C-alpha cells in the first residue's frame, strides 16, 4: 500500500496476475498479487479510520456501514466520493469526514434543484405559451434565476388575477412561470421538509402521501372507532374558517415561520413572497407557497384541539375541520375555545359551523359521510358535486361540438370525477352519470365517424 492511498482501495492499473482484474489487499494493507482466495478481495473503500466502534459517536458508526462506490476521483491529496448527488470530501488516510453541505438558501438556487423545480412546474402546462417560452431558452433562464437568487436581485412579476366560480366564487392570483419554478424549489427543498415536521397526522392537505381520499378514510375510521366504544349516540362539530386565505395576517405568519426557519436569506425570499400582495392581510390562492403557509397558520389549532381540549377524533383539511365526541355540551365549549383561538390570529368561524348528530352525518371533502344503526359508515357524493359535474360535462360537450377541444379532453375530465366518485358508495350514481355522458358524447362521435 502506497503512502497517501486509502486503505482497501487502489485506483491505478489493475492487477495483471488476477483473472478477475481485482487487486487484493492483505489484512495489513499490503498488496496480494497471487490468485489464491483472499478474504479481503475487492474491499470497498472505508470512510473512517480503522478503530473500534465504541470510540465513535453513534451517528458516525451508522455512516460507516453505508456502501460507497469504489470509483473515486483523485484530486491532489484528497478523494471526492459521490453520495446521493452531493460531494463528500474525504482525506486519503482513513476517509475522515470533513463534509460539504449546502445551506438552506443555497439549495433553492442550486441549478439541479431549479431544474427539478422546472420539471414539476411544467407538468400539465407544457402546451401553454408561458411554459413554451421559458423552455426555448431553458438553460439561460435557469442560470439567470440562479444568479438573481444568489445575488438577491430576484423580483416577483405581477400576478395574473382572474375569478373561478366552482365550487364557489374565488379570486385567484396566478404568478408567472419563472416564479412558479422558484416557489417549487423553495417549497420542495426548504419549506416542506422544515415546516411539516410539527404537523399532526390528521392534517390532510397538500402533503405527500395524504390528500382528500386519505382524509375521508380517516373520518371513516374515526366513526367506526367511536361506534365500537360509544355506539351511535355521538355528535360531530363541523367547522370552517370564513375567507381563510384572504384573512391570514402577514405579521402573524412571519412570526410562525421564524419559529422554524432561521436562515436570513431564506427569510428574505419568504418575506418577498408574502409581501407581494397589497396590504398586510391575505395571501394569493394561486401560489404554491400559500398552501404550506395556510397549513402552518392553523398548525397551532391542531395541537390545541388534540392536546389541550383532548379531542381524540379530529381532522383538518386546510380550513375545514371536524371534531367527534359523545358529549354535545363539551363540543359547544370546544367551539367557544376554538373561536377564541382563531380570532387571536385574525380569523373567524364561518356561520355554517355547527354541531350535528353523528347519525345524520357530515359534509366533508365532497362527500356526505354518516353512521348507520348497525355501525356501517356510508359515504355518498354530495348533491352539489353531482350537479357541478353535469353542468361541466354539458359545457365540455358544447366545446367539443364546436371543435375547440377533442374528445379525449372531455373523457379525461369525466374519468377524473368518476375516479373520485368511486371512493364512495356511488354505484348507481356512476351508472346514471355514465349514461348521461354517453348521451352527450357518443352520438357526436358516431356522426363524425360516418362523415369520414
State each model region's role.
Residues 86, 175, 180, 184, ...:
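Right-hand nucleic-acid polymerase module
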Residues 17-25, 153-164, 269-277:
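Active-site-adjacent bridging/hinge elements
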Residues 141, 148-149, 217-318, 322-339, ...:
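Conserved polymerase palm-domain catalytic core
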Residues 7, 37, 61, 68, ...:
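Aromatic (phenylalanine/tyrosine) cluster motif
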Residues 54, 66, 74, 83-253, ...:
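Conserved two-metal-ion catalytic palm core of "right-hand" nucleic acid polymerases
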Residues 13, 30, 59, 70-72, ...:
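Ala/Thr-enriched low-complexity intrinsically disordered regions
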Residues 1-57:
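C-terminal, surface-exposed recognition/capping segments
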Amino acid at each position: 500500500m502506497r503512502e497517501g492511498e486509502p486503505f482497501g482501495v487502489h485506483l491505478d492499473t489493475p492487477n495483471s496476475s488476477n483473472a478477475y482484474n481485482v487487486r487484493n489487499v492483505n489484512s495489513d494493507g499490503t498488496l496480494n498479487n497471487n490468485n489464491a482466495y483472499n478474504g479481503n478481495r475487492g474491499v470497498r473503500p472505508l470512510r473512517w479510520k480503522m478503530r473500534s466502534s465504541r470510540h465513535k459517536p453513534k451517528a458516525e458508526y451508522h455512516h460507516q456501514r453505508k456502501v460507497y462506490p469504489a470509483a473515486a476521483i483523485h484530486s491532489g491529496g484528497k478523494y471526492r466520493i459521490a453520495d446521493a448527488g452531493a460531494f463528500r470530501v474525504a482525506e486519503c488516510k482513513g476517509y475522515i469526514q470533513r463534509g460539504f453541505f449546502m445551506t438552506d438558501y443555497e439549495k433553492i438556487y442550486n441549478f439541479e434543484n431549479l431544474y427539478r423545480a422546472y420539471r414539476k412546474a411544467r407538468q400539465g402546462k407544457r402546451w401553454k405559451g408561458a411554459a413554451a417560452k421559458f423552455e426555448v431558452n431553458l438553460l439561460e433562464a435557469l442560470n439567470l434565476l440562479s444568479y438573481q437568487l444568489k445575488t438577491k436581485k430576484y423580483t416577483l412579476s405581477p400576478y395574473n388575477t382572474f375569478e373561478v366560480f366552482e365550487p364557489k366564487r374565488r379570486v385567484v392570483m396566478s404568478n408567472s412561470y419563472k416564479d412558479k419554478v422558484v416557489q417549487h424549489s423553495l417549497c420542495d427543498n426548504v419549506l416542506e421538509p422544515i415546516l411539516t415536521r410539527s404537523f399532526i397526522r390528521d392534517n390532510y392537505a397538500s402533503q405527500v402521501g395524504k390528500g382528500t381520499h386519505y382524509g375521508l378514510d380517516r373520518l371513516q375510521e374515526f366513526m367506526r372507532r367511536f361506534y365500537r366504544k360509544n355506539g351511535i349516540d355521538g355528535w360531530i362539530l363541523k367547522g370552517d374558517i370564513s375567507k381563510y386565505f384572504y384573512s391570514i395576517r402577514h405579521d402573524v405568519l412571519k412570526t410562525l415561520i421564524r419559529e422554524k426557519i432561521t436562515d436570513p436569506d431564506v427569510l428574505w425570499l419568504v418575506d418577498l413572497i408574502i409581501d407581494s400582495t397589497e396590504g398586510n392581510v391575505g395571501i394569493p390562492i394561486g401560489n404554491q407557497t400559500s398552501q404550506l403557509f395556510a397549513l402552518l397558520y392553523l398548525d397551532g389549532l391542531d395541537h390545541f384541539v388534540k392536546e389541550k381540549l383532548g379531542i381524540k377524533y379530529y381532522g383538518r383539511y386546510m380550513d375545514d375541520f371536524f371534531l367527534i365526541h359523545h358529549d354535545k355540551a363539551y363540543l359547544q365549549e370546544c367551539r367557544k375555545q376554538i373561536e377564541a383561538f382563531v380570532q387571536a390570529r385574525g380569523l373567524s368561524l364561518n356561520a355554517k359551523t355547527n354541531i350535528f348528530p353523528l347519525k345524520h352525518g357530515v359534509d366533508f371533502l365532497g362527500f356526505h359521510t354518516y353512521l348507520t344503526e348497525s355501525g356501517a359508515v356510508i359515504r355518498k357524493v354530495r348533491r352539489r358535486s353531482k350537479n357541478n359535474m353535469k353542468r361541466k360535462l354539458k359545457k365540455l360537450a358544447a366545446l367539443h361540438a364546436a371543435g375547440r377541444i377533442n374528445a379525449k379532453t372531455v373523457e379525461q375530465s369525466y374519468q377524473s370525477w368518476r375516479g373520485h366518485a368511486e371512493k364512495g358508495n356511488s354505484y348507481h350514481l356512476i351508472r346514471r352519470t355514465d349514461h348521461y355522458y354517453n348521451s352527450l358524447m357518443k352520438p357526436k362521435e358516431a356522426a363524425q365517424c360516418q362523415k369520414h
